[in-house]
Amino acid sequence: MTHAPTPPAASNFLRPIIEDDLQANRFQGKLWAGKPGPAALQAQGQPDPARIRTRFPPEPNGYLHIGHAKSICVNFGLARDYGGVCHLRFDDTNPEKEEQEYVDAIIEAVHWLGFDWQADGNDNLYFASDYFEFMYEFAEALVQAGHAYVDEQSAEEIRASRGTLTEPGTDSPWRDRPADESLLRLREMRDGKHPDGSLVLRARIDMASPNINLRDPVMYRVRHATHHRTGNAWCIYPMYSWAHPVEDALEGITHSICTLEFEDQRPFYDWILARLAELGKLARPLPHQYEFARLNLTYVVTSKRKLLQLVREGYVDGWDDPRMPTLFGLRRRGYTPSSIRLFCDRTAVSKSDSRIDYSLLEQAVRDDLDPVAPRSVAVLDPLKLVITNYPEGRSETCSAPRNPHDPQAGVREFPFTRELWIEQDDFREEPPKKYFRLFPGNTVRLKYGYVVRCTGFTKDQSGKVVEVQAEYLPDTKSGTPGADSVKVKGNITWVSAAHAVPAQVHLYDRLFADAHPDGGDKDFLACLNPHSKQTVQAWLEPGIEAVPGATWQFERLGYFTVDSKDSRPEAPVLNRIVTLRDSWQAA
């Protein structure tokens, strides 16, 4: 895996914690049987070759986005840096929302981002559904030990009895039922003898706890739904807050790294692990949960509900629309894996919520592409320029560096002819002050070509300038002796009209015009940027091989890539990745 140049180090509060754990030998004696399992299995294992174990645990109910990329980079990066292993685990405990399509897409996205979960001869690709038998066995053990009970209240009754931040909850009438009675009901739940929502398994903790999450949280609920992996084998499914610590412990995770919304769940996480370890079900040392602030970007929404609405209502062209914050959208836009890793490395890992300006993501891809992207010329808004004193039918070769940062890349060659395409913005009939490009009587250099002097222009019936005339100075060709004898203040790019390659170019910009589209009571759809996609018919420098994924810096314009979906050899389609400079004011 090739990484971008090392960025300035961003703070990461987790690093000192891990270093302290390793220095104190907190995981010394930790055993690993080569696969996840309970204490009895791990006791048969060898000392764990991984110094630490982390995990990236997506739910397979959608496509990964830039926020997930941060979590991926944090978990895989810490494991890499400290001689550990990062697991890819699918938290597939909600059968009504999960699909194999998303599993496949997540695997592809994590691989594309540059990370691998194979280590020490193990695949380290896991599914929560692989642990359903363990979870159920542990649930029975908790019931028998008096730590859990089956509640027959409705969801509304449970909610009403939970209390508030200032008032304690009320005990369920089923809280003190005998353990064998709860065990019987739990087995009936598993055997499909009760309808959805009729019974739940709850932990017996403390209904007066100041932390509402410890007021007998629900662990299992009845759901007669087909699971994408287990089919109809189960009709009870674990709640995430119960499954999460069990999964971590079975996999020997040392540092369970979550986003801040799970901070209030940590006491329940610790309670579950402690009770199951006391019962001999889970091996010590136990995992510890740490929370960091999720990545929030200006001009972006990452809510699955809102992204789905954008797709379903046609505001974007699917999940891989180049304006979407999904990893597939960013990939199609032309963002490289190394640019996204670079961006994530430049953002701090902290416990304080903040918003990162979108310009930092754009700058990361500029910094990543600048040293490697070949240069070329494109004209996006073409205007004909005729060199009136240049012979008709004549063509000569001009040359330019493929990449000024890499002399080994060599030069590119392209023809100069009588008729050229230039940008509309490079001519003014009546120029403003400090305008140094073409206007009647002014002299400019055609970059890599000749110096020319504007002699006239032609308008159509509507008054639009459709052609500019100029004369060239024969002794001023770039790279020849005496070429700099004529001093000019303006340089403009061009392509030969007879040789240029026609292409459709999508000029993508930020999807939202508001820096905080999901803030407060805003209608996020009202914040959409009406200019987030503009399509133009452009002319490209000849010699460009428009294969999907090929990327260039078009001089003066920005970075562009060949669209992976719509481009064809006979009809190239390109996407603008990013402009050369930030054109937005800081949010």
From Swiss-Prot:
Q: Which Pfam families match?
A: tRNA-synt_1c (PF00749), tRNA-synt_1c_C (PF03950), tRNA-synt_1c_C2 (PF20974)
Chain sites annotated for binding ATP? 59-61, 65-71, 259, 294-295
Q: Where is this motif: 'KMSKS' region?
A: 301-305
Keywords (alphabetical) are: Aminoacyl-tRNA synthetase, ATP-binding, Cytoplasm, Ligase, Nucleotide-binding, Protein biosynthesis
PROSITE patterns in the record, alphabetically? AA_TRNA_LIGASE_I
Q: Cellular location of this protein?
A: Cytoplasm
Motif 'HIGH' region in this chain: 58-68
Q: What is its main location?
A: cytoplasm
EC number(s) for this protein? 6.1.1.18
Question: NCBIfam families annotated for this entry?
Answer: glnS, PRK14703.1
Q: Which family does it belong to?
A: Belongs to the class-I aminoacyl-tRNA synthetase family.
User: What does the annotation say about its assembly with partners?
Assistant: Monomer.
**What is this protein's name?**
Glutamine--tRNA ligase
